[in-house]
A protein has these predicted regions:
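Short amphipathic alpha-helix with an adjacent loop that forms part of the alpha/beta core around
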Residues: 35-42, 117-123, 175-178
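Class I S-adenosyl-L-methionine
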Residues: 1-85, 93, 210
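Short, glycine-/small-residue-rich phosphate/pyrophosphate-handling segment
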Residues: 2, 91-124, 133
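A contiguous loop/helix-start segment that scaffolds small-molecule binding in enzyme catalytic cores
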Residues: 46-47, 125-216
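Structural motif
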Residues: 10-13, 29, 52-54, 112, ...
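A short acidic, often aromatic-flanked loop/helix-cap motif at beta-alpha or helix-coil junctions
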Residues: 31-36, 91, 114-116, 162-165, ...
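Short hydrophobic/aromatic-enriched beta-strand-loop microsegments
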Residues: 24-30, 76, 83-84, 103-110, ...
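Active-site glycine-centered loops adjacent to acidic/histidine catalytic or metal-binding residues
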Residues: 88
Length: 217
């Protein structure tokens, strides 16, 4: 799809990973900006918006589709723009594959939701997955777990997954109080006492601990 696009739209980092020589691009990630471009360039018949992660899990795709639909409704031309979502490799499946942990029993939560919901998920599940929007989110997450007496938990933080600079750091939550890595990171929390009745296959808790060096690509 990217190779056949008349124009590629997305954040600079995303465009850099897929653009081919001579291909037209437009750097933008806000739904309104992307929609404005689409509607103001009717000559571009095949526009591809490149987003990271899974389009069904707290993705920018959700708001973008809603913004385009709203614009179509207001324009009175419902067929002016046709949309299609093409999923790639999701962040959760990528991180879990690297850790050799199946994610069928993992609880998926938003770090930007209510703190009580996140803590409940960690307490009641062996594994909890969330996405972060900044390094500060990772530090805050570690502190929140410690303050909630969940300091026995371990974390795996994956940054730039599937990219050349991919890095996965593993360790006890205490080790992430000073995290200063990539802003866009995926976090998998392992609670050795969570979800005692759940059957989860994969790495043992002791294998989840980082040790002397980070796990990298």
């Amino acid at each position: 799809a990217c190779e056949e696009a008349d124009v590629l739209i997305g954040a600079s980092r995303m465009l850099k990973s897929v653009v081919k020589e001579g291909q037209q691009t437009f750097a933008a990630y806000k739904p309104e900006e992307i929609t404005d471009y689409i509607f103001s360039h009717p000559q571009d018949e095949n526009i591809v918006v490149v987003l990271s992660g899974d389009p069904g899990f707290y993705s920018g795709a959700k708001k973008l589709i809603l913004t385009i639909r709203d614009r179509l409704k207001k324009s009175g031309e419902p067929d002016r723009v046709k949309t299609e979502i093409l999923p790639g490799i999701s962040t959760v499946s990528s991180l879990c594959a690297k850790l050799q942990i199946p994610w069928e029993d993992i609880k998926l939560v938003s770090i930007h939701g209510r703190e009580e919901n996140l803590l409940a998920a960690v307490k009641n599940n062996k594994y909890t997955f969330t996405l972060t929007g900044s390094a500060a989110d990772v530090r805050k997450l570690a502190k929140t777990l410690i303050d909630a007496r969940l300091g026995d938990c371990n974390m795996a933080v994956g940054a730039e997954l599937t990219y050349e600079g991919e890095q996965i750091l593993k360790g006890n939550v205490l080790e992430f109080l000073d995290y200063d890595g990539d802003n866009l990171a995926a976090v998998l929390i392992a609670n050795p006492y969570g979800g005692e009745n759940a059957v989860t296959h994969g790495m043992n808790d002791e294998e989840f601990i980082r040790g002397d060096v980070p796990m990298t690509k």
